Regions:
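Receiver (REC) domain switch/output surface
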Residues: 113-124, 159
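Two-component/phosphorelay signaling modules centered on CheY-like receiver
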Residues: 10-34, 42, 47
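His-Asp phosphorelay/catalytic-motif detector in bacterial-type signaling
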Residues: 44-46, 73-79, 166
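Short amphipathic alpha-helix used as the core "switch/output" element in two-component signaling
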Residues: 38, 53, 57-76
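AAA+ ATPase active-site-proximal loops
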Residues: 135-178
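C-terminal output helix
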Residues: 35, 87-90, 104-117
Length: 178
């Protein structure tokens, strides 16, 4: 099941955001940095919405940025969507530069937020699928050719050897032989 962590200190927004997703996604809510880190470790969410204005610096973004750094260190595969105020594009851009996947500007619009969160889930799914496919090839890639079977790997190695070897006999055009 998809897992979403909502980090928001405003109880009204918490309940609105939870309402947007609770029927299709496992949702956990945290109001501050410590509870967010506890929930992150407990539920291992694929997607996290993070309000940058968290206590004790609810008017600023320092606590949100500190939490973003910790999330990216502890759960680098999670997709973080930074939630900002309408006039706060500068912090949103800074968060993207730090490694957040996307941003969403308040006020809450359930349709747009749902779209942004579902897009983040899809990106997380595609990245996981890509990691699994790479694992299935056991790193068996030769110069951009992906082969899974041992026989194909042997053919690729032979081609690689021949491609870089110098011919011992000069190549003579066909018409010179007649």
């Amino acid at each position: 099941m998809k897992r979403l962590l909502i980090v928001e200190d405003d109880p009204g927004l918490q309940s609105q955001m939870r309402w947007c997703f609770s029927d299709q996604i496992e949702v956990s809510v945290a109001a501050d940095r410590d509870s967010a880190l506890t929930a992150l470790r407990r539920m291992e969410p694929q997607v996290i919405t993070l309000d940058l204005g968290l206590p004790p610096d609810a008017g600023g973004a320092s606590e949100g940025f500190a939490l973003l750094e910790e999330i990216l260190r502890l759960a680098p595969m999670s997709k973080v969507i930074v939630v900002t105020g309408r006039e706060d594009k500068e912090n949103a851009v800074k968060a993207i530069g730090m490694g957040a996947s996307d941003f969403y500007q308040k006020p809450l619009d359930a349709d747009i937020l749902t779209f942004v969160v579902n897009r983040a889930f899809r990106l997380a799914e595609l990245e996981q699928e890509n990691r699994e496919l790479i694992g299935q090839t056991n790193g068996a890639s030769i110069k951009g050719i992906v082969a899974a079977s041992p026989e194909m790997m042997e053919i690729c190695r032979t081609i690689e050897k021949v491609a870089y070897s110098r011919p011992r006999l000069p190549l003579i055009p066909d018409e010179a032989c007649h």
